């Protein structure tokens, strides 16, 4: 099983080929290929490579499928014994990326 742990926009993701992941918004066009080069760990069928902090020999190639928005999160604040209430919603901008290849040199 080939997988990699990649850092994207400050978060770490366990990535496998052929699957898609919802990441924070990446400002690029649809159907464009991207290269993820901040690879922290790679597993090539039992051979584990660990970066310090990143692996220069491993590149992850993906394709942007769509831009979407996440589920709505409700933020509700109130002060007890007062008439102060504040209800606010938030939807995160996301980008769906299909991982096509994990290339290990």
From Swiss-Prot:
Q: Where in the cell is it found?
A: Plastid, Chloroplast
The yes or no answer to whether the keyword Signal is present is no
Q: Which PROSITE patterns match?
A: RIBOSOMAL_L21
Q: Which InterPro entries match?
A: bL21-like, bL21-like_sf, Ribosomal_bL21, Ribosomal_bL21_CS
List the GO terms this entry assigns under cellular component, sorted alphabetically.
chloroplast; mitochondrial large ribosomal subunit
Function, as annotated, reads: This protein binds to 23S rRNA.
Species of provenance = Thalassiosira pseudonana (Marine diatom)
The family note in this entry says: Belongs to the bacterial ribosomal protein bL21 family.
| Membrane spanning residue stretches | none
Instruction: Could you list this entry's UniProt keywords, alphabetically sorted.
Output: Chloroplast, Plastid, Ribonucleoprotein, Ribosomal protein, RNA-binding, rRNA-binding
Q: Which GO terms describe its molecular function?
A: rRNA binding; structural constituent of ribosome
Q: What is an annotated GO biological process for this record, any one?
A: translation
Q: Which NCBIfam families match?
A: L21
Which proteins does it associate with, and in what oligomeric form? Part of the 50S ribosomal subunit.
Question: For this UniProt entry, what is the primary localization, expressed as one broad class?
Answer: plastid
| Full protein name | Large ribosomal subunit protein bL21c
The cross-references to SUPFAM superfamilies, in alphabetical order and at most eight, read:
L21p-like
Superkingdom classification of source: Eukaryota
């Amino acid at each position: 099983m080939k997988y990699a742990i990649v850092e994207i926009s400050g978060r770490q993701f366990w990535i496998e080929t052929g699957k898609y992941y919802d990441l924070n918004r990446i400002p690029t066009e649809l159907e464009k290929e991207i290269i993820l080069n901040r690879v922290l760990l790679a597993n090539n069928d039992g051979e584990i490579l660990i970066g310090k902090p990143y692996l220069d020999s491993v590149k992850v190639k993906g394709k942007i499928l769509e831009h979407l928005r996440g589920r709505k999160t409700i933020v509700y604040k109130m002060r007890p014994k007062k008439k102060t209430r504040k209800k606010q919603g938030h939807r995160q901008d996301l980008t769906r990326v299909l991982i096509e290849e994990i290339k290990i040199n």
